[in-house]
Amino acid sequence: PEIGYFSLLNIESFIDYILLQELSKNVDAYRLSTYIYKDKESIDNRIYAGPIWDINHGYGNCNYGETWLTEGWLLEYNPEGGDQISFWWELLWNDTNFQTLFSERYQDLRSTIFSDNYINGIVDSITTHLGPSIDRNFSRWPLLGNYTWPNYYVFDSYEEEISYLKSWTSERLRWMDSELSTQITGDINLDGSVNVVDV
């Protein structure tokens, strides 16, 4: 409390990390499969979040932790039992200044790489690139129409999976829009404005 976390963390990396984990609603976020790192002091003495990895149980593809639902903050879902979210994630999340910067960053990304058109374009591009390997994959591993842990839905075709991914992501973004449309005010460096570059 005396020093504050802004001098200890690269805030931009934590904001982007949380935004991506919340967009995907990745059940392994914050509690498992989480990387943070620090360079040597001569380069930067702050802690960075990332890289993101292991999102196979994200985007509505998991039947526990309420991650199939498009609403709700994953960071706020912390039931009793194993695999608890570490307390410091909650402290960061509940900080007014962090929330303001988080909301601003989301608004910036929503008009670019978080736009529905951009995301659907990436999905379509990857699907096209994979081409015939999709059929070969399911020929080798006949998973379509069969339950595989911990999938929430069982799809009969790859096209159904792609449609679900796009629909789920779009609905998730609608919910995030509703939550982040009003920015929380905060002034990190007491200069009368709040901006990511001030961090």
Name what the model sees in each region.
Residues 25-27, 189-192:
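Residues in Ca2+-coordinating acidic/glycine-rich loops
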Residues 1-31, 37-39, 44-184:
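Middle-to-C-terminal accessory/interaction subdomains
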